[in-house]
């Protein structure tokens, strides 16, 4: 019997295999209790084109005095920031890799904010 974490990692591997066959850049998300991380990785998986996280000093100033990166507002800020960085790197279309996390809460907020900022997926 697989633990919850093993199940999530298994889903993540299967998703990455499917995305790799598409050959487009992927927007990958990692979520911890304190922070949320997002990066855009090239279609062949060898290069990070853009990255953003709530651990960055500029983002912590933007999300408020508390500096908490583990909430929906912080995820929205990261979604907007990663979309801006990806567009600056010349990436318009990505595949969304949620790394096995449920499409709910912070993950959904990040995805919606990235879409609103102009990324297509």
UniProtKB/Swiss-Prot annotation:
InterPro entries (alphabetical): Ribosomal_uL18_bac-type, Ribosomal_uL18_bac/euk
Listed GO biological process terms: translation
Sequence intervals crossing the membrane: none
GO MF annotation, one: structural constituent of ribosome
HAMAP family from the UniProt entry: Ribosomal_uL18_B
Family to which this protein belongs: Belongs to the universal ribosomal protein uL18 family.
Protein name as catalogued: Large ribosomal subunit protein uL18
Organism annotation: Polaromonas sp. (strain JS666 / ATCC BAA-500)
Taxonomy of the source species: Bacteria, Pseudomonadati, Pseudomonadota, Betaproteobacteria, Burkholderiales
């Amino acid at each position: 019997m697989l633990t919850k974490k093993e199940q999530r990692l298994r889903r993540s591997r299967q998703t990455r295999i499917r995305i790799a066959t598409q050959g487009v850049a992927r927007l990958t998300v990692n979520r911890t209790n304190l922070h949320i991380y997002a990066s855009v990785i090239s279609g062949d998986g060898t290069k990070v084109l853009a990255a953003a996280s709530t651990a960055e000093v500029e983002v912590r100033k933007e999300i408020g005095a508390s500096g908490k990166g583990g909430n929906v507002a912080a995820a929205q800020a990261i979604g907007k920031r990663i979309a801006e960085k990806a567009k600056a790197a010349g990436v318009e279309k990505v595949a969304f890799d949620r790394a096995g996390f449920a499409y709910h809460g912070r993950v959904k907020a990040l995805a919606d904010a990235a879409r609103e900022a102009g990324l297509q997926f």
